Each structure stands twice: as C-alpha cells, then as structure tokens.
C-alpha cells in the first residue's frame, strides 16, 4: 500500500511575517540598549551632579542659619539684653531617585557626630604680671555621604563653621569659617571661633530631611599681653578634612603676612614654615594617617615682639544643639 507524501508548500506571506517580527524585535532591543547604555547613564550622571551642587547650597544655608543665631546672640550681649534662643531648620536632600525600571535610586547618608573633628586651641597670656594658660576645645560635624554610581562619589561636611567638599582626588573648603588675621605695626590681631555641635543621629535614603539647629550658649573672649615666648596652638585632629584646613589657614595667613619660608611635601605630610628673616613666625603642618585615612592639622603662631608679635587674640565659642530628621539623640542641659 502506497502512502502519498505531500510536498511542503512555500508561502511568501509566512516568511515576510517572520522576518518582520524579527526586525521589530531587533529595533526594540536596539532602542532598549540605547536607553540602558546611553540615556540612563547620562540622565543619572546629571541628576547626581545636580544633587551634589544642591546639597552644597543646602549646607551653606545650614551654616548661614547658625551664623545668624550667633550674630543675634552677639547683638543681645552688646545691648545688655537676654538672648532668646530660636530653632532654625534647613532641608537637605539625601539622594537621587532612579529612572523607573532602568535604574535604581542613589541613596545618601546624613550623619551627625558630636565627637568628630575635634579642635583644640591653647596659649599663654599675662594677667597682672602672672602667666596664665588657656586651653579650649570643640567638636562635632554634620556630614552627607553620597556614594554616587555614575557621578564622582563625594562628601559634603560642616564642621567648626566651615563647609567642605570632599572626593578621593581632592578636598577644599567651599564656605569659610571664622578665622582672620590683621597686621598692624608689626603685630598680629587674630580672630578664631570654636563651634561645638551636640546631638547624635544618622539617616539614609533619598528623601529630604530637616536639619534643625539651636544656639544655646555663646561667648567671646579677647586676650592680650602675651609673654615674649608665647605660642598660639591650633590643632585639628582625627578629621577627614585636615588637608582642607591646612590649605585654608595657610592661605589666610599668607595673604596677610606675605612671608617667605620653607615648604615641604611628601605622600603623607605637607608643611610650611613661614619666616621673617631667620625668625619663625608660624608653622603649619598636615599629616595623614594611612590606616584611618584621617588627618592631623597643627598650627603654631609664635610671638616675636618687635618683629611680628601677637597683639590680640579674639576667641569666640558657640554651642549648638542639632537634630537630623527624627533619628537624633538629644543632649539634655
């Protein structure tokens, strides 16, 4: 018994439909590839960059709020009236929302640490012919860490009245703290501020959090009559931003005093010794601990009567209670 086997019949319409489907898939995959590999990285890079610039401005607003409270306290003291504390708040954006489906958000971490970035000021002065020693300190920082995936990862921090911007290849102070040097008749008039932050908290995400501040203590002291061998010490220990402080303070002193000296630099150390002739006027140094990644910055200003002496040292103190969102442990007074 013979069985009939029919030949397969060619159908040009079926071939065209298959080819069309494949081409449509290729176009879709190409378009999807362009979005994932080109559009999303550019979009996220711009978003993360814009976020860092906005956060820098927000930290500047936070500093401005504290500075205004200190000015109000000074005005109240000068007028002999009681300063009523006020609480100010500044909104800070933590991170960046991603592109739905194609990219996840970039979270940031905002941390308030009352023990970070300690500053110490020490010197001797004369009162009624007796030598007295002064030693003051302050600490505390608010830091935003943005582990950007497309833009350069950065940190923005506020410590002792300064706003810093930090990344792996550099750091600098963007908003200056209170530190000034005046030169008159071969004598130096120096002003500096110590600002302590109280409270402890940390929050992570892409939300916008309120950072509140309340100045609860403020005072200003003026010192004069320094011993002929007096040294004014300003030390900044265990800070990620010690190199920024080194450059800022050295530049401030150099712009006013206009002295030559000796500059040395290694992979872990940077130092400048300013001299007037053979006499050392100031010595500033920044040293990196490679284990912790933290700097120690030391500044010593020497009293050299008749050459470049110390006439006045004005030291301002401020204590500020800070709150970060709802995650802050308050300090009771």
Spans of model-derived segments:
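N-terminal leader/signal peptides at the extreme start of proteins
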Residues: 1-13
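Extended hydrophobic/Leu-rich segments
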Residues: 4, 21-24, 123, 257
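N-terminal single-pass transmembrane signal-anchor helix
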Residues: 11-38
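Beta-strand/loop motifs with alternating small/hydrophobic and polar/acidic residues, enriched
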Residues: 18, 34-172
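Intrinsically disordered, low-complexity regions enriched in Pro/Ser/Thr/Gly and acidic residues
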Residues: 112-314, 329-333
């Amino acid at each position: 018994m013979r069985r009939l086997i029919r030949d397969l019949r060619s159908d040009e319409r079926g071939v065209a439909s298959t080819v069309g489907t494949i081409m449509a898939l290729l176009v879709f995959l190409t378009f999807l590839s362009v979005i994932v590999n080109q559009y999303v990285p550019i979009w996220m890079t711009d978003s993360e960059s814009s976020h860092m610039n906005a956060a820098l401005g927000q930290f500047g607003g936070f500093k401005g709020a504290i500075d205004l409270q200190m000015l109000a306290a000074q005005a109240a003291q000068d007028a002999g009236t009681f300063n009523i504390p006020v609480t100010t708040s500044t909104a800070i954006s933590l991170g960046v929302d991603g592109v739905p489906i194609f990219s996840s958000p970039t979270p940031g971490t905002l941390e308030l640490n009352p023990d970070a970035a300690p500053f110490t000021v020490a010197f001797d002065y004369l009162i009624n012919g007796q030598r007295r020693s002064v030693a003051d300190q302050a600490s505390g920082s608010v830091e935003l860490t943005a582990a950007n995936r497309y833009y350069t990862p950065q940190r923005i921090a506020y410590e002792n009245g300064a706003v810093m911007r930090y990344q792996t290849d550099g750091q600098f102070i963007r908003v200056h703290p209170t530190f000034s040097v005046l030169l008159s008749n071969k004598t130096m008039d120096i002003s500096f501020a110590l600002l302590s932050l109280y409270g402890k908290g940390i929050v992570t995400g892409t939300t916008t959090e309120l950072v509140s501040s309340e100045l609860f203590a403020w005072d200003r002291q003026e010192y004069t009559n320094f011993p002929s061998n007096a040294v004014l010490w300003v030390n900044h220990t265990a800070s990620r931003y010690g190199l920024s402080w080194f450059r800022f303070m050295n530049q401030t002193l150099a712009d006013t005093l206009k002295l030559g000296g000796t500059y040395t630099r290694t992979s872990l150390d940077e130092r400048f010794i300013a001299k007037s002739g053979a006499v050392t006027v100031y010595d500033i140094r920044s040293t990196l601990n490679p284990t912790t990644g933290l700097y120690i910055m030391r500044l010593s200003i020497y009293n050299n009567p008749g050459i470049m002496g110390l006439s006045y040292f004005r030291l301002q103190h401020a204590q500020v209670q800070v709150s970060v969102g709802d995650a802050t442990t308050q300090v009771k007074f």
